[in-house]
Amino acid sequence: MLSILLTLVCSIHARDKWPIRRQDIAEAIPDEFDCEMRKAAYEYGQTLLPRMEEFETLWYALNLNSEECHAEPKSKVQKAERIPKRLDDTVTDRNAVYVHPTKGNDENEGTSTSPLSSIQKAADLAATTEGKKYVALFAGTYYLSETIVLTSEHSGLTFQGVDGEVVVSGGVKLEADELDWKPHDTDNGKNIWVADIGKRSEEVKGLQIGGKRMTRARYPNIPNGIEVSCGYGCMLDGAKGDWTPPVPLDSLPPVEYYTDKDPAHTKNDTGDDWFLYYMIGVNGRCAVYDPPVSYWCSENPSGGGAFAFLTPSGVTIDPKNLPNSPYADPSDAQFFVWRPARWANWMFEIGEYDSTTNNFTFGYGGFQGARGEEVGGDFFVENVFEELDHPGEYFYDKHNGLLYVYNNASSGTPPPTENVVLPNLKILVDHKGTQWDPVRKVQHKGIKYIATSYTYMDPHGVPSGGDWALDRIGAIFLQGTEEVSFDGCTFDRLDGNGVFISGYNRNVTIMNSDFSFIGGNAIASWGFTNETEGDNHPQAGIDGTDGNHPRFTKVIGSTAREIGLYEKQSSFYVQSKTAQTLLKGNVFFNGPRAGINANDGFGGGDEITENLVFSTCKHSNLSII
């Protein structure tokens, strides 16, 4: 059973009035009601999260800074009630191993006066030293060269700061002496610069300057950059592409159909006789998934707009619609293509390019949603040098090691040389246990996680009969855990998913934490099930009785905003093959698709209560929750 109690959910989009996509409906809403509803939402959000005080991000999101509907941002917390953060004086040399981001050395003892430099080394030392239960982090930014891996040996540890903000970054920081910016094109008001940063051992898949994302060179442009929503804009209309039909089915691995007609498993009370049986198809067009199995490749899928999964295999674009083409070398380009009706967006690499016809044959990709179509919807092309024509864009020439940046400043002003970071790692902290040997009672307190690289081209699977596909990966990854918690943490500018709860997990708690500017989902949870006789696909069957799935997850008193920047089929919280989740007292806004998504009814016992959720489906169609 899914319980949704006292949750204020409003589907809104960017208009002057509290927005609704249908203008005729929006115009019918009285201005007075619209304004009072916004003010009520602001007050409710502050009531849920008094720690946010003025809660300016919520205030701006509700457009309460407008003249037509204005409210002053005031904190509900009186100054006398504001308790400053205090250092935890229970953390001492006796019970902690200390780490320092700039003054540490892994040859040191790990004391407060002789700290280590590596969080991993500190965790390992604490795990093997009697009486050590804290990894104490001095303030600063820790640039990880490798993922922190926590196993059952690290059970019982607490990671927290001791003297200020602790930032854990998956990025590679470019030093000032690596950035000898030289003018590339600064004529006629342009401001494009280039620096030779060398051929990198890590793939350059993103760029952050001053803590904010730059936009990979693309067409159409995004006027205010990737972090500012265009809503339905900044795309080419799908009708401006001549879509190449899907690859013929007979050229793909043969489809194997499986339908479970065990009477004990038959669901015989559904409308229109939909979803009576557990059904899957293996391989065929679903060979793009990992595992290569999906309900939407089964013999007779049912549901709204139901038909077997397929995607176009390429597109031809008239140069008048792609004015900077034909391209000299689009081998590293990517196409971002909405499925018609905007249920999900596919990403494709380029397999072949014919510059005479401007035909792009798609290569790897197209697995970022479970529902297909023969043609593409609205789309854009990214990571092409010829499209470097707008402030805030960049392009990395991997063949020559050259980084080009169109600096958003007056012509002749070079880009900064400080705080220039290449997001690199996909996972910052990996909790790696099993159902029989779990990672237990690890706590993360007050840590900020930033700068992971995108994962939308990583393998995706279809979790269940809903129309989602997911990449089983996140900046924080949990598999095989019990009672792991995150309290007061910040997840910011992560290009993939924020937290991913995979397989066996019990009592994961995320509380008093904030997610912002996330490339995929803020939090995703996806369990495993087993095959049944004749199914022959582990981790994709109907049997969930072995307990290899998340239960009793709690997301409490947290915020999530500006998510799904890259992969549009993303939510503040999504779950599949997960049970008994509690979402309480959260504030979620500004997302491209449904705010909260249960991809199936596995297990039941979920409770969604006392949340504020709005500005969902900002880029897409259908539901808000």
Located regions from the model:
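Extracellular polysaccharide-degrading/modifying enzymes targeting complex plant/algal/animal polysaccharides
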Residues: 17-480, 485, 490, 531-547
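Short glycine/acidic-rich loop motifs that flank beta-strands on beta-rich extracellular proteins
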Residues: 146-147, 426, 453-459, 473, ...
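Residue-level detector of conserved, well-ordered beta-strand and adjacent loop positions
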Residues: 100, 138, 160, 169, ...
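Cleavable N-terminal signal peptides of Sec/SRP-targeted secreted and luminal proteins
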Residues: 1-14
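Flexible loop/turn segments at secondary-structure boundaries
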Residues: 8-9, 143-145, 452, 494-495, ...
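Short, intrinsically disordered, charge-balanced linker/junction segments flanking boundaries
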Residues: 13-14, 125, 608-625
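Parallel beta-helix/beta-solenoid
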Residues: 152-154, 163, 204, 345, ...
